Amino acid sequence: MADWLLYYTDPVYDAAFSLVTESPLLLSHDSDVRILFQLWLNLTVLGAILYLAGASVNFYFFFDQETLKHPKMLKNQVRREIYLSLESLPYTAIVTVPWFYFELKGYSKLYDTLDSWWEIPGAMLGFFLFTDCLVYWIHRGFHHPSVYWWLHKPHHTWKVCTPYSALAFHWLDGYGQSCPAHLYVYLFPMWKPLYMVSFVALQLWSISIHDGIYISNDEILLSCAHHTIHHLEFNYNFGQYTTLWDRIGGSYKKPVQEFANEMYFDKLKRKKEALLHGKVDGGDVGGKQKTGPIATTISAVAAEGMKARRGF
């Protein structure tokens, strides 16, 4: 994948560098200085584009805007989330570059030619099972008191999340939880286009589990409902895609009944039925709308978490 990042952006860098220097360190495609700089800037810019595009589409088209009125929502939270995310990306890119550099030098097991389409499901399953396991233990490790306060606590500033919360963390936190995805292709063979798709899917999944849209209350799939509990109660649901490792590690907590009543498609159905009867969810048409259902649900979970911590 690193070779694609360089090949398709080489003309842009050639034109830019030729305007300011004649040094072969920046003009030669074989120069390590040029390669490292180009990889770093590409990762920073593409990471920002993917984050802003994915989170913005989710925020403006799917996210329940009533959640912004929740009392646990911080002042200017969305702006602060975006700022922290974009501030962290260049630093995350610096420590991520070596993975791509050594891939370029032939140390990874990525390959260009697909021999059989049957390779795809096996590789995808392996990738997601591998990363699900390692991300769980890395994430749980970041909750250890020795590192939590400076490394992972910035991400838990957001008790009530928005899609922009997905990458709003300390740069080393983001890097640590991305390492399993990079490590996988150094241990197991994978087709380059599939790796790229899987990597993008991983980023979009991270956005989806912070968006407050409860599509699933499944016992196996770890959804936004599970991750909302993690942000509110801290010591549960560390997993990324499934509840498997939370169950093994004794940190699984099933979403409370309020979540089951707020599944996304059920809400759409109820809202449609309400509109047919001249009402909208949360208040009469044209009237003053009440607190949104997601905000109400979050309040219920927060209250339950407080009771649990106090021993009630």
Regions found by a protein language model. Give the residues of each.
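Juxtamembrane helix-loop-helix connectors linking adjacent transmembrane helices
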Residues: 70, 79, 94-130
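Alpha-helical transmembrane segments of multi-pass membrane proteins
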Residues: 47, 51, 124-135, 181, ...
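Function-critical hydrophobic alpha-helical transmembrane segments in multi-pass membrane proteins
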Residues: 117-156, 165-166, 178
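Alpha-helical transmembrane segments in multi-pass membrane proteins
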Residues: 29-92
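Hydrophobic alpha-helical transmembrane segments
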Residues: 36-44, 86, 121-125, 175, ...
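Core segments of transmembrane alpha-helices
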Residues: 87-96, 103, 172-185
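Cytosolic/stromal cytosol-facing helical appendages immediately following the last transmembrane segment
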Residues: 1-37, 60-74, 145-312
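Membrane-water interface at transmembrane helix exits
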Residues: 54-63, 96-104, 135-143, 185, ...
